[in-house]
Amino acid sequence: GAAVAAAIYALAANQVKVNVTGVIPMCENRISPSALVPGDVIGSYGGKKIEICNTDAEGRLILADAMAYMVKDEHADRVIDIATLTGAVVGMLGFSTAGLLSDDDAFCGAFLKAAQTSGERYWRLPIFEEQKQMIESKIADIKNMGRDYCGTITAGLFIQAFAQGRPWIHLDIAGTAWTDNPLYQGQPQGATAAGTSSLYYLLAG
């Protein structure tokens, strides 16, 4: 959410003339008598029924609703989601590179060019049909989690399912959003504002 707010602020502060909408989904995340449990099937803003396989894969549920809102209510013609979503991306890429998924080569290329300008590192991950099959459900439209592997990719593909075919980019910044190394890309220790400058350069053209 911070990257979205900061990018929108930077665009406004620099009077960049671009039509962009930022959505920051938020909710409380705590145990209650009505909390999700494995095996639940819940509805979503996009109309899909979701089988809950793992209650720790909860952040993607509100990202899916935000994605559906962008398409349904804001009529977005291109969509990007960004989140500190999975621990799997840290195991794969470490703390200096963020994961990226996209179904549109031109859109992805434009973003990676912007990222090069910003100095941020992203690595595009592959999308194959068998990975999509990992989140197919027999009792709902989709599962909120696949198996114990390929977690970064299946998390992104879950969100993509709510993009309604719009050109889409998914950024998993779980490893790059915070640093304990004060020398990392010239950043002080702490939050890095990961994604903000890349989004800005993409949208500013």
Positions of predicted regions on the chain:
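A generic structural signal for tightly packed, nonpolar segments enriched in small/aliphatic residues
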Residues: 1-205
